[in-house]
């Protein structure tokens, strides 16, 4: 594969990744309605949703930064393909603490929900965020 085709491929891939990351926010209002959140659960639900949104937005920002770094690397005559792996590792490490925090908040919320609500919430997470919680 020629360098030009390789650059084009990676550029298109990065554009797709950045658009996908920015469109990744699920409809948490819909989840709240499906869960029928009670007043004593509302505060933890809001905290959980906030921490989840922060983690997802961090992925979007990291994807944009990743795209910029890779675009700069691909513009070189001899791109360093190891830079792709380093940039990916940096992105994962940058967002890992936010996903841990979000996971901890979901566990706290589960403790307040009844069994049916927990199943609804877990189904929602698998459906909308499965790529992040595998």
Residue ranges and their predicted role:
Residues 3, 20-134:
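Charge-rich (acidic/polar
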């Amino acid at each position: 594969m020629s360098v030009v085709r390789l650059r084009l491929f990676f550029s298109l891939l990065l554009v797709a990744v950045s658009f996908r990351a920015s469109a990744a926010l699920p409809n948490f209002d819909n989840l709240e309605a499906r869960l029928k959140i009670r007043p004593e659960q509302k505060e933890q639900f809001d905290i959980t949703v906030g921490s989840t949104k922060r983690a997802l937005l961090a992925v979007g920002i990291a994807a944009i930064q990743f795209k910029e770094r890779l675009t700069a690397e691909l513009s070189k005559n001899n791109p360093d393909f190891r830079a792709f792996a380093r940039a990916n590792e940096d992105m994962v490490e940058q967002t890992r603490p936010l996903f841990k925090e979000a996971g901890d908040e979901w566990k706290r919320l589960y403790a307040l929900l009844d069994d049916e609500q927990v199943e609804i919430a877990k189904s929602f997470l698998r459906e909308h965020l499965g790529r992040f919680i595998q």
